[in-house]
Structures are given as C-alpha cells and as structure tokens.
C-alpha cells in the first residue's frame, strides 16, 4: 500500500507516486487538494473548505460535492486502500479533514528549507550556498499553483512563494558574486531588473 509520494505545487499541481503521475481528477477536486496543501497536517473545517473552494457560488449542494471530491482524492491518492476505510493520507477529523503528508514530500516545503539552508551558508561558504540555492530554484516548474492562479484561496500563497523565489534568486546571485562570477551573472541580472524593476 502507498509508496513514495511527491506533491508538487511549484508549477502545475501534480502528485507523483513512485515516479508515476497520479490522476487527480476534475479541476475542483484538484483545487481541493491544492487548498489542503497550503496548510498540510492541519484540520480544515468543512465550512472553511467550502467557503474557500466555492466562495459565494449559489445553486450547488456544496456539502455533497465536497464529500464526492474527498472520496475521489482518497481513491486517487491511495488506490490500494480498502473500501470503506479511511486510509492514511486524507483523514476525517472533526470538524473536517486533514491532509497527512510528510512535509518534505511537498516541493514548496523542500524549497523553503533549502532556501533557508542556502542563505545561512552565503558568508561562510558561498560555493555551497550557490549549490543549495540552485537546487531550491530547480524545484520550480512554472508559477506556484499555476492552475489556480485565478482562485481566491491561492492568491496569498502564490504571492508568498513567488516572493521567496525572488529572494532565493537574489541570494544565489549574492553567493555567486562572492565566488567572483560577476561576468557570468550579467545577463541574468539584466533579466531580473527587467522582470522586477522596483526590487
């Protein structure tokens, strides 16, 4: 049962189990998983989930739809789970649900950890700092939560991660400058200034 799971939000949302991409279903079902990944290992109330996913939308049985999406995600994430059992990933916890994942299984969490490690190394070991920050930046496959760019629940998390991405690039540039690589950085710095003129 199970296997190694990777949850990727630094680009289009996807989940990889033992090297194979998991079919996460319809957009709203994927949106539910994306929402839960913004704060994993925390109980989300059903009311908070419904408000986040559906907002003020009228005309649907949102409680029933949520149950259908939870069921669909459970099947997708744990296909070997016995019927009518909860499994170990998407758990029912009063007053709602909890996504139980190892933090390092989420690319955004790994990214944050690597950025902190890289920044801490800049002054003492700029070579190692550049390497670690490069590893962090390599986790990005597009814009954070790319397929949910227009959904209200994702906006603050997208902004937070994109800001951290820019900080990581700046920190890697600082490390590379300390390594004496100023010539190699000219085109990258010009591109950064064009993309972020107010930074």
Language-model segment annotations:
Residues 1-199:
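Intrinsically disordered, low-complexity protein-interaction/activation regions
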